[in-house]
Amino acid sequence: MRHRKSGRQLNRNSSHRQAMFRNMACSIVRHEVIKTTVAKAKELRRVVEPLITLAKSDSVANRRLAFARTRDAEVVGKLFTELGPRFQDRPGGYTRILKCGLRTGDKAPMAYIELVGRPEAAEAVEDTAE
C-alpha cells in the first residue's frame, strides 16, 4: 500500500527521478520557463520553490546547500543574485503552471512552468526529458 507516500513515481527509479528534477530545476532557474508534462511540472514545484526560498537569505551556508541540490555554480549564482532579491517580499508561490494542450506523439497533457514576474523577453525552452 502507498499510504502517506508523497510525490509521483513517474515510472522512474529514485536516482533517475532525482537527476531529472535536478536538471529541470537548473533549466527553470536558467531560462525561467520550460515546457514539460503537467505531472512533471507539478512535481518540479516541490523542488524549485524551496530553492528560491533558500536564496532569499544570502549566506555561504545557503549557497553550499543550493549547490548540493543543483550541482551547478552558474545556477547558484543566478539564484542568489537575481531570483532571491526578486522574490524577497513574496512569501511563496514563485512558480506558475500554464496548461498548453496535448503532446503530438502520445497525447500527454503538456504545460509551461514559469517563474512569476519574469521578464517577458524570455523564450520557452522545450523539455527533452522523457
UniProtKB/Swiss-Prot annotation:
Q: What GO molecular function annotation could you give as one example from this UniProt entry? A: structural constituent of ribosome
Annotated GO biological process = translation
Q: Where are the transmembrane segments?
A: none
Q: Which SUPFAM superfamilies match?
A: Prokaryotic ribosomal protein L17 (SSF64263)
Q: Which UniProt keywords apply?
A: Ribonucleoprotein, Ribosomal protein
Sorted alphabetically, the Gene Ontology cellular component annotations on this record are: cytosolic large ribosomal subunit
User: Which Pfam families does the UniProt entry name for this protein?
Assistant: Ribosomal_L17
Q: Which family does it belong to?
A: Belongs to the bacterial ribosomal protein bL17 family.
Quaternary state and interactors: Part of the 50S ribosomal subunit. Contacts protein L32.
The protein in question is named Large ribosomal subunit protein bL17
Q: Which organism is it from?
A: Shewanella halifaxensis (strain HAW-EB4)
